Every structure is written in structure tokens, then in C-alpha cells.
């Protein structure tokens, strides 16, 4: 199991577990999610699992800024990706891992709106299929979406595609 403080290096990337703490059995199963920060050069990825906004606020003291790519918490549900997290991290890219036509309508419209107002480029596996981000130390970030259909959603800016929620 992952525990806060674990760290390792591989293939030029530094992996750091930010959550959960050693004593975490009193937390809900969502709040025991593994939160992982991956750094390659100056680019940073943050995966927050299903942690709640309360845990997100605690994590803000641990995260190294800036964050290039954030995998949105809990598939983009309204229980995660709170305003404080969004405004502190201001990620360049946000990825929602959600099933196509999922019953919960993830990502939630409020979450999409928060990231849109923060200027983040947003991608969703529900619409874009498999999304691959490559972090290369000297080249920055490149992205490939298996099923890119920009006509199905609003643009965040001229070079970036936004997602829409069913809610």
C-alpha cells in the first residue's frame, strides 16, 4: 500500500506519495486513496485519486508547484476538485478519467467550470478515449488523444479543447 513519504526515481522521473498518512484507517475508503506526485524536469503530474475536498486542502501544503497536469479527483465529481485546490494549483492540463455516458454524469458541470475559469486545458477519457501525455525533460509536454472530437464541446482557448458535463 502507498504511504505518505514514499519516494523513488525511475527513468528520469521522481515519484512521491503525498497521501495517505500511516494511520489512516479512520478515514473513508475514498480519503485513503493514494495521492501521487510525479516530476520530470520542471513538469509535474498530480494524481489525487478519490480524496475529498477536506483532504485536498491538507494536501495543498505538500504539493510542489506548479502542477502541469492534474488528474481530476473522483472522476470530476463535485466531492473533489474544490475551489481552493483549483485556484492554488492552476494546472495547465486537467484529465478526467470517466466512462463514456457514465451514470453519474462525470465530470460535474461545476468542476468543469472551475477549471475553465482557471484557464486549464481539459480532457476527458469519456470523450477523448485514451489520452497519453508524454513528459520529456527537454521538450515539455506532448499529448495524444485516441478519439479527439473537438466539434462535440466548447473550446477553452484556441489551442485547447474543453469538456462538457452531462449535468
Regions found by a protein language model. Give the residues of each.
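Non-globular, low-confidence helical/coil segments that flank catalytic cores
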Residues: 1-167
Amino acid at each position: 500500500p502507498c504511504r505518505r513519504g514514499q519516494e523513488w526515481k525511475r527513468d528520469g522521473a521522481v515519484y512521491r506519495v503525498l497521501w495517505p498518512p500511516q494511520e489512516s484507517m479512520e478515514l473513508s475508503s475514498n480519503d485513503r486513496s493514494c495521492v501521487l506526485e510525479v516530476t520530470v524536469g520542471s513538469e509535474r503530474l498530480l494524481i489525487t485519486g478519490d480524496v475529498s475536498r477536506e483532504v485536498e486542502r491538507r494536501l495543498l501544503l505538500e504539493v510542489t508547484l506548479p502542477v502541469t497536469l492534474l488528474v481530476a479527483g473522483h472522476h470530476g465529481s463535485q466531492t473533489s476538485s474544490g475551489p481552493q485546490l483549483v485556484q492554488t494549483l492552476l494546472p495547465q492540463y486537467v484529465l478526467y478519467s470517466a466512462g463514456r455516458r457514465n451514470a453519474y454524469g462525470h465530470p460535474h458541470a461545476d468542476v468543469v467550470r472551475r477549471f475553465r475559469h482557471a484557464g486549464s486545458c481539459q480532457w476527458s477519457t469519456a470523450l477523448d478515449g485514451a489520452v497519453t501525455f508524454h513528459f520529456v525533460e527537454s521538450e515539455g509536454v506532448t499529448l495524444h488523444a485516441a478519439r479527439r472530437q473537438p466539434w462535440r464541446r466548447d473550446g477553452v482557448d484556441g489551442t485547447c479543447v474543453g469538456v462538457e458535463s452531462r449535468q
